[in-house]
Structures are given as structure tokens and as C-alpha cells.
């Protein structure tokens, strides 16, 4: 396999789901891939900024920066394995993750993004890891699939009794009142209590 064929093969598979899962629109497929690449770049950049916070003797920010940089490298390896052509195993790992369902990738990205935010709360960790979390949220939406058509949703609502068109309608006008509750009486004057 030539170098050009290898690059073409790495770039030609934006989130193909071989298991035949829910079909996502093209803009979500390519948008999630682009968002993942941008998120990985900023996570690495801001992770380096957090690592440089060792000057202020903040060990938790140092560890959070290292975790954020590792998360950025993992996301970059899974979203754009063409960036790691020199490492042979990256392509096979990316293929294995692409074979998994979308919710696996969504959970992985969200789980990797949370620890740096809690360890060192700041703009660098919030923005860098927040973009990775947003990528995981987009993959989660893709895993849920498309919404049903309006006619399908109406039919499901009528079958379940929701939506106001229930099959068992009542003619009693007090059907919504709680049992043993008395209605308000407006016939007499309000009695006063003189024992106050």
C-alpha cells in the first residue's frame, strides 16, 4: 500500500457505522469529526498551559494538564489518525473504535473530559476539556438517532393515551377532581369567627 492510498483510506471514513446503526445526517458526521480535531488541538494547547502552572506550585493543575494533553492526543488519534502516520498501531485502534457503537465514543470522550475540569478549574481546563465534552455530546446525539416523523409520533401518542385524544373519554365534568374533595360553595356569605 502506497503512502497516498494510506492517507486516502484514513481520511475517507468519517464515522461509518458498519453495524448499521442509526443513520446520522452528513453535517453531524463531518461536524463531529471537525469538532473533535479542533477540540483535540485546543485540549493539547491548553493542557500545556496548565502544565506550565507548575511555576505557581500547583500540582493538581500539573496533573490536570497532563491528563488533558493525553485526552487531546487520544481524541486526535481517533478522529484524525492521519496525524499519526508514523505510529502503525493508531490506524488499527481507530478502526476498532470506529467499529464500536457511537455511544461508546460519546462515553469515552465525556469521561476523559471531566477529570481535568474538576482537578484544576480554570478557563484553560474548562475550554480545552469542554470542547472534548461537546464532541462527546455530539456523538451521543448521533447515537440516539433521528427523531421519528410527525405521523409516527402522533400514532404513538394516540396508542398510549397521551396527547388529549384518549380512547376512554369520560362524560363526568368532575373527573379530574380528587376523590372526596368538596367543590367550592359561593351561595352564602363568609362566616366570621368571633372567638378570636
Swiss-Prot record:
One of its GO terms (molecular function) is identical protein binding. Keywords: Calcium, Calcium channel, Calcium transport, Cell membrane, Cell projection, Cytoplasmic vesicle, Endocytosis, Endosome, Ion channel, Ion transport, Membrane, Synapse, Transmembrane, Transmembrane helix, Transport. The record marks 79 as: Calcium ion selectivity. The chain crosses the membrane at residues 35-55, 70-92, 113-133. GO terms for biological process: bulk synaptic vesicle endocytosis; cell competition in a multicellular organism; clathrin-dependent synaptic vesicle endocytosis; photoreceptor cell differentiation; positive regulation of neuron apoptotic process; positive regulation of presynaptic cytosolic calcium concentration; synaptic vesicle endocytosis. Its main location: membrane. Belongs to the calcium channel flower family. InterPro entries: TVP18/Ca-channel_flower (IPR019365). The keyword Ribosomal protein does not apply. The gene is flower. This is Calcium channel flower. Transmembrane protein which mediates synaptic endocytosis, fitness-based cell culling, neuronal culling, morphogen gradient scaling, and calcium transport. Regulates synaptic endocytosis and hence couples exo- with endocytosis. Controls two major modes of synaptic vesicle (SV) endocytosis in the synaptic boutons of neuromuscular junctions (NMJs); Ca(2+) channel-independent Clathrin-mediated endocytosis (CME) in response to mild stimulation, and Ca(2+) channel-dependent activity-dependent bulk endocytosis (ADBE) in response to strong stimulation. It is found in: Cell membrane; Cytoplasmic vesicle, Secretory vesicle, Synaptic vesicle membrane; Presynaptic cell membrane; Endosome.
